[in-house]
């Protein structure tokens, strides 16, 4: 019998795998009708730009404090553009990502990458010096023993 095997010869990991699969399938079955209900509710009040062609009437601008509190489109990015849908001629707001915001996030990411690289470069240098000292100490002991 394998080490860590159960009574029937299956490893314990096999039992855990079957339990995990059964639990996952049960969750998927339980959530499927809920997702369909959410989709049916959201499609009735969905913005026109999801289903139609649209024209941007105002470019991407930062939201004012009032817009942030009252317009749900401002919540995710803090920027909004005004659009007009072609078929329904409805004017709506659409959340957008500002080029300035993207540039700021890019340089912040680059700064973090450079900082992490510098930290690990310093760690490599310190470790290399430790190993060099140990090697020199071994050589010195070998020379002394002669």
UniProtKB/Swiss-Prot annotation:
Keyword DNA damage in record: no
Induction: Up-regulated by TGFB1 in mammary epithelial cells.
Post-translational changes noted in the entry: Undergoes N-terminal proteolytic processing, removing a peptide of about 1 kDa from the N-terminus of the protein.
Designated name of the protein: Protein JTB
Membrane topology: Single-pass type I membrane protein
Gene: Jtb
Coiled coil: none
Species whose genome carries this gene: Mus musculus
Family indicated by similarity: Belongs to the JTB family.
Annotated compartments: Membrane; Mitochondrion; Cytoplasm; Cytoplasm, Cytoskeleton, Microtubule organizing center, Centrosome
Gene Ontology biological-process entries: apoptotic mitochondrial changes; mitotic cell cycle; mitotic cytokinesis; positive regulation of protein kinase activity; regulation of cell population proliferation
GO molecular function: protein kinase binding
Residue ranges crossing the lipid bilayer per the database entry: 106-126
